[in-house]
Design a protein with these regions (language model features):
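Hydrophobic helical h-region of N-terminal Sec-dependent signal peptides
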Residues: 11-15
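Secondary-structure junction/capping motif
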Residues: 3, 36, 123-124
């Protein structure tokens, strides 16, 4: 299923000022590794901004939570500590249910359906973000999600008590319904959490599996 979307956010005031100001330098925190396709896409965005502004707006990309951790990025942009950032917005669904619009299981099960869902939600999402002083710049869907475990899973009983990495309210609820223990872990911390046993299972895309070399810690997808 297509279960989550990563968004690029900026402060409305700074975005408006950036077009007129010369030689602006911005920081853009991203939660994912440098070779993750969301980060690669963000770098293409940064390069395009530099080109179309003739170098008057130069954005430095900070990958893998190196400037701000994933759960700090949205707030950092709101407070002006970062002028722009990319964030998995469904992680903030507890703040406003609109932010979790794309995390309902099986609501969108293809990229086309994900695009349609994004378009349907855009107006309401923009309104909520604007009220917080934020502007939505672009959104990118993740590939289909799957469950990663370190053992065969034949029934719900096999999942009982497993520490499960959750990244939003929906994945925490999935864990609870399956009898697992939801544990909030950001993407940049996932590899260490798996290696140290802080979590022993999670739901994510094949892209994340490659980023984190999950086969070194888990055995079943």
């Amino acid at each position: 299923m297509i279960g989550k979307t990563t968004l690029a956010l900026g402060t409305a005031s700074l975005l408006a000022a950036g077009a007129a100001a010369a030689a602006e330098n911005w920081d853009m925190p991203v939660a994912y590794p440098a070779d993750n396709y969301h980060t690669v896409n963000a770098q293409k965005f940064v390069d395009a901004v530099r080109e179309c502004t003739g170098g008057n707006l130069d954005i430095t990309l900070h990958a893998n939570g190196s400037l701000f951790k994933g759960d700090e990025i949205k707030r950092a942009v709101q407070t002006g500590d970062a002028q722009i950032g990319e964030r998995l917005l469904s992680a903030h669904a507890n703040e406003n249910a609109v932010f979790g619009y794309d995390s309902v299981p099986f609501l969108a099960t293809s990229f086309d359906a994900s695009d349609a869902l994004r378009d349907a939600a855009r107006s309401t999402l923009n309104e909520v973000l604007n009220e917080q002083g934020l502007t939505l710049l672009y959104s990118v869907p993740w590939p289909p999600q799957g469950l990663y475990f370190g053992q065969p899973i034949e029934s719900k009983a096999d999942m009982e008590g497993i520490k499960f990495r959750a990244y939003n309210a929906a994945t925490a609820r999935v864990a609870e319904l399956a009898g697992m223990v939801p544990t909030q872990i950001e993407a940049a911390e996932l590899k260490q959490a798996l290696a140290t046993g802080v979590v022993a299972a999670f739901i994510s895309s094949g892209s994340t599996g490659v980023d984190e070399k999950v086969w070194e810690d888990l055995t079943h997808f």
